[in-house]
Amino acid sequence: MAQLVLFDKARVAAWVAQEVGQGADWGSYYAMGVERDGQMIAGVVINNFNGANATAHIAIKRFTKAIIPLFQAVCDYAFNQCKLKRLTGMVPSNEPHIIAFDKHIGFEEEFIMKDGAPGADMHVLVMWPDKCRWLRKE
């Protein structure tokens, strides 16, 4: 059975880094994930906090219903606990399936950085708290 991993940020972050090819240190970050049978199958790292914005990095190896509470926990942390005004995702244009997935979960295209990624443009995506379907409505 899949379960949330909310309090082992180093383990989740190491797995996400491997999955997304992150070679650099995350800096100040928080991470949450989903594991099944002791193996990570999904994770989100949030870093580059500046008080209003942070960057989200998402890795999913296997889809499960536990992805829903993961996104709820991530958005609750970002928007309710950290009081961020936005979450930012950056995806190279040569990864159209990732852009489509991010839009499916609620990110919107904000702009495209010409030559912002090695060999590609960089899509800058944003999730706004007032449009976030993962937040529980009061």
What are these regions (language model features)?
Residues 90, 108-123:
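Conserved catalytic-core motifs of GNAT/GCN5-like acyltransferases
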Residues 94-111:
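Conserved active-site alpha-helix within GNAT-family acetyltransferase domains
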Residues 50-62:
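Conserved acetyl-CoA binding element of GNAT-fold acetyltransferases
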Residues 1-22:
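Short amphipathic alpha-helix that is part of the acyltransferase structural core
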Residues 116-138:
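C-terminal "cap" of GNAT-fold acetyltransferases
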Residues 21-33, 54:
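A short helix-loop-beta-strand connector motif used in the catalytic cores of GNAT acetyltransferases and
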Residues 80-91:
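Conserved GNAT acetyl-CoA-binding A-motif
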Residues 39-47:
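Conserved beta-strand in the GNAT
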